[in-house]
Amino acid sequence: MLSPKRVKFRKQQRGRMRGVATRGNTIAFGQFALQAQECGWITSRQIEASRRAMTRYVKRGGKIWIRIFPDKPVTMRAAETRMGSGKGNPEFWVAVIKPGRILFEMGGDEITPEIAREAMRLAQYKLPVKTKFISLDEQEQSAGASAPAAAAATVES
């Protein structure tokens, strides 16, 4: 299971999930990726379950990159505990996910779009957030389509 080796503070506040991912929202390593469509918390167990599902499907065919890391501790109180007496102990670790964040990437010579799509579909079932399959070609096309429009807008003003 993924978790930080050491942290400066043992306990964190829960926080709010607003806005979209400004970092980690483009494909950096592979040819195919799984992108989050909504915000949420993904635990280290869910990340590991998704990784296992993908690895078992592609076998030794390609490489899988995990682009998220669970760095937020979630605390819980013992069952049937009275109110007060401080914050609970850290029970598990989560990664905070915002829409647009790339969760997993996949690439390699033997990985076809069909294999990658099926492996990512198996991983999707293990995750608590809505996701979509994207490829490097789709990302470049969407970036290429928006670039001329942005350039035209800057020329006119």
From Swiss-Prot:
Keyword Ribonucleoprotein included in the entry's annotation: yes
Record-linked Gene3D superfamilies: Ribosomal protein L10e/L16
SUPFAM superfamilies reported for this sequence: Ribosomal protein L16p/L10e
Transmembrane segments: none
Swiss-Prot/TrEMBL GO biological process terms: translation
GO cellular component, as recorded: ribonucleoprotein complex; ribosome
A GO molecular function held by the record: rRNA binding
InterPro entries: Ribosomal_uL16, Ribosomal_uL16_bact-type, Ribosomal_uL16_CS, Ribosomal_uL16_dom, Ribosomal_uL16_sf
Highest taxon above the source species: Bacteria
Family membership noted in the UniProt record: Belongs to the universal ribosomal protein uL16 family.
Protein known as: Large ribosomal subunit protein uL16
Annotated organism of origin: Synechococcus sp. (strain WH7803)
